[in-house]
Curated annotation (Swiss-Prot):
Keywords assigned: Cytoplasm, Differentiation, mRNA processing, Nucleus, RNA-binding
Entry function: Component of the cleavage factor Im (CFIm) complex that functions as an activator of the pre-mRNA 3'-end cleavage and polyadenylation processing required for the maturation of pre-mRNA into functional mRNAs. CFIm contributes to the recruitment of multiprotein complexes on specific sequences on the pre-mRNA 3'-end, so called cleavage and polyadenylation signals (pA signals). Most pre-mRNAs contain multiple pA signals, resulting in alternative cleavage and polyadenylation (APA) producing mRNAs with variable 3'-end formation.
GO molecular function annotations of the record: mRNA 3'-UTR AU-rich region binding; mRNA binding
Domain of life: Eukaryota
Species of the source: Dictyostelium discoideum (Social amoeba)
Name this protein carries in UniProt: Cleavage and polyadenylation specificity factor subunit 5
Family affiliation: Belongs to the Nudix hydrolase family. CPSF5 subfamily.
Major subcellular location class: nucleus
GO cellular component, as recorded: cytoplasm; mRNA cleavage factor complex; nucleus
Residue span(s) of domain Nudix hydrolase: 45-170
Amino acid sequence: MSIKTLTLYNFNTSYSFGKEEKKEKEQSLTSKLARLKDSYEKEGLRKAVEGIIIIHDHGHPHILLLQDNNYFKLPGGKLKPGENEIDGLIRKLTKKLSPTGTPVSDAPWEIGDHVSTWWRPNFEPSLFPYIPSHITKPKECKKLFVVTLPEKCKFAVSNNLSLIAVSLYEIYNNSQRYGAVISSIPALISRYTFVYLNVD
């Protein structure tokens, strides 16, 4: 398998950031699992997509995460019934990270490889990179895609969230703080070679 090269731009000089009044669902674990149960009862398996957005700071890869107090998550969300995964991820990233009114057709996201699939066997917090042998009807399937950015773009997130860049060495093997999915990212993207560019 050939090694792919990704071009990363500087977090501090390439991008601008703002906050807006955006309608965000309650982020508590209890409310999230309640929504999952309601969705499962109506539609069956919940299908979700999330983006591993990679940038650099001082020549080291960082991942963009949304933070709500001490809760961290990758940007993304639930697919609509029958929605294509790439289209759905672009829609969710645009809704959560772009200024209000940005057409999906103008979205800056460059969706790359699907690098991981995670399964939620029950209405509980735990996710696994496989379906446990005793589970016949998992409740959620979450797919992670690598996302890169052009040299310039503008972010705008909900007032109650922060968009932060976290280094790979902070994330790696740190499931206690970031959870199993996010802490696995350094291994998932180790197959890539990165080129670091700085734009004034």
